[in-house]
Curated annotation (Swiss-Prot):
GO terms for biological process: queuosine biosynthetic process. PANTHER family: 7-CYANO-7-DEAZAGUANINE SYNTHASE. It comes from Pseudomonas putida (strain W619). Binds 1 zinc ion per subunit. Signal peptide: none annotated. This is 7-cyano-7-deazaguanine synthase. It catalyses: 7-carboxy-7-deazaguanine + NH4(+) + ATP = 7-cyano-7-deazaguanine + ADP + phosphate + H2O + H(+).
Length: 224
């Protein structure tokens, strides 16, 4: 039987951990990729490693990027405060072109691995309004992937899978629980401390807490 491989973007947060579990349940051999991109919440990298071990991925790779050299986001520029109340429009926690960059590197690894599926945990229901989390972006990137690669041109098409795209945060939590995700291993907070404890105030913390509450599941998040 031919091995079915997938490259999965794993941040270490709730959504991406759920996606790994979903892909594994579908019979994929999972290869996870995380990024040390200068984010202020580097505790998520430790969380990603924990999740990868717990879910038994084949290989977990961490790629170094200096997106903090570009700046323009509260997640990569310490001079920009992380908002603690909801605002209008695209928030300052948006990292310019982040998912485009991440998916491009995942695409390169997928081509080397001869994997045809790339999974990303973006969501367009309970989310912060980032433009690179929308279905239109995912569809456009898939078209580009099949135009810009040797494998794509030779007819071995890539699929960009975003299984959480139309799910509420509560539905995501329920899907993960059904597949054995240990959410105590994950970190979602934009300004988590070195031990992975959360602030409980940022947009990501609010979405996470609301998701557990709506799902009727005890929230294992630790706060500072």
């Amino acid at each position: 039987m031919t091995e079915k491989r997938a490259v999965i973007l794993l941040s270490g947060g709730l959504d991406s951990a759920t996606v790994v579990a979903m892909a594994k349940a579908e019979g994929y051999s999972c290869y996870t990729m995380s990024f040390d991109y200068g984010q202020r919440h580097r505790a998520e990298l430790n969380a990603a490693a924990r999740v990868a071990r717990d879910l038994g991925v084949v290989e977990h790779k961490v790629i170094g990027l200096n997106l903090d050299g570009i700046g323009g986001s509260a997640l990569t520029d310490s001079s920009i405060d992380v908002p603690e109340t909801p605002g209008e429009g695209i928030p300052v926690t948006y990292v310019p072109a982040r998912n485009t960059v991440f998916l491009s590197l995942a695409l390169g690894w997928a081509e080397v691995l001869q994997a045809r599926d790339i999974f990303i945990g973006v969501n367009a229901v309970d989310y912060s309004g980032y433009p690179d989390c929308r279905p239109e972006f995912v569809e456009a990137f898939e078209r580009m992937a099949n135009l810009a690669t040797k494998a794509g041109v030779e007819g071995q098409g890539f699929r960009i899978q975003a299984p959480l795209q139309n799910m509420s945060k509560a539905q995501i939590v329920q899907a993960g629980m059904a597949r054995g995700v240990d959410y105590s291993l994950t970190v979602s907070c934009y300004q988590a401390d070195d031990e992975g404890r959360a602030c409980g105030k940022c947009d990501s913390c609010r979405l996470r807490a609301d998701g557990f509450k709506a799902a009727g599941v005890e929230d294992p998040t630790r706060y500072f």
